Amino acid sequence: MIRAFDAFSLPLLRLFDAEDAHRLAIQGLRLLPQVKPRPDDPKLAVRAFGLNFPNPVGIAAGFDKNAEAPDALMRLGFGFVEIGTVTPKPQAGNPRPRLFRLERDEAVINRMGFNNDGSEAVLRRLAARAQQGGILGVNVGANKDSSDRVADYVALIETFAPVASYFTVNVSSPNTPGLRNLQQAAALDDLLARVIEARERVRPSAGDTPVLLKIAPDLTLGELDDVVHIARSRKVDGMIVANTTLSRSPLLRERTRMNEQGGLSGRPLFRLSTRMVAETYVRAEGAFPLIGVGGIDSGGAALTKIRAGASLVQLYSALIYKGLGLVESIKTDLASTLLRTGRDSLAEIVGADAPTITAEEWPV
């Protein structure tokens, strides 16, 4: 069924503006038959952040910003779904056009600006599907015009704790002016302290919801030292590495699009984000697991991310070019690798290549 859907939808969606195509894709997912996914190979199961993931392949925030199709995505075989970024108040985001395909590079540039329906509408949707199960993360961010951005994060933790499997604190989007300043040491320490306090306040009624921190790939190694140190000291449950990049590789082929303002994702981000996964893994010293994001478009790419230090991986941009069948393809490749190498689980290879990767020349 998925192959047929991809064969029909991918050429059709290319005829539309990138954002319109995305909107159509979300609507199309909601129309798919409610067929149970094929059972995952038990060897692909991952335990991380106190949660049991059926497989390590998730969909990154940004695809289903408003929690319109999380269950359809789970039925497609994703091991977990992350919705958002959600802000307290509804937000229109930046003016269009704000989403661009770089087709020859299999990349995307976006400057969306946290466009979303706001916490009230998204909470209503999540509450309505609360009995469906599955691991559903909520990616939270601050409103652009907020006078107290930290208070926005705190409010969102308190709002979504009853329905979130985990939280992602997004301080790394490049498309909200000043947001990345929250990655600076003093600001980040204050933010995480208040977020963890909020989580503790709602624990009696909502349980112990893991809190993850999502970082940019553009941090210097000195800045990464500070970020990981603070994350460890504030006892966050994990990190997501990494968001989109503001850098532009000279190897990009779509010269007319490459200088569009915004964050770059997709295949050109793979080497940089993988290096940042390895650097973070080495610094975390086993304190918490990582989710690796950026340029994963095959089973081999997912395996590289895992061997760099990621316990789980997330996709988004590659789905635009490879289709939804990519999910099962990656899982099949990972299971085959475990069988071929005589491994019982992916946990046995997490971080195996991190020392080698961190010793390599910095990626261009």
Curated annotation (Swiss-Prot):
InterPro entries assigned to the protein according to its UniProt record, in alphabetical order: Aldolase_TIM, DHO_dehydrogenase, Dihydroorotate_DH_2, Dihydroorotate_DH_cat, Dihydroorotate_DH_CS
Membrane topology recorded in Swiss-Prot or TrEMBL: Peripheral membrane protein
Residues annotated as binding FMN: A61, G62, F63, D64, K65, T85, N139, N170, K214, A242, G266, G295, Y316, S317
Name of one Pfam family that matches: DHO_dh
Biological process per Gene Ontology, one example term: 'de novo' pyrimidine nucleobase biosynthetic process
CC cofactor note: Binds 1 FMN per subunit.
Keyword annotations of the record: Cell membrane, Flavoprotein, FMN, Membrane, Oxidoreductase, Pyrimidine biosynthesis
Domain of life according to the entry: Bacteria
GO cellular component: cytoplasm; plasma membrane
Active site: S173
Primary location class: membrane
Keyword Calcium: no
Cofactor: FMN
Function statement: Catalyzes the conversion of dihydroorotate to orotate with quinone as electron acceptor.
Subunit structure comment from the entry: Monomer.
The family this protein is said to belong to: Belongs to the dihydroorotate dehydrogenase family. Type 2 subfamily.
Protein name (record): Dihydroorotate dehydrogenase (quinone)
Protein source organism: Rhodopseudomonas palustris (strain BisB5)
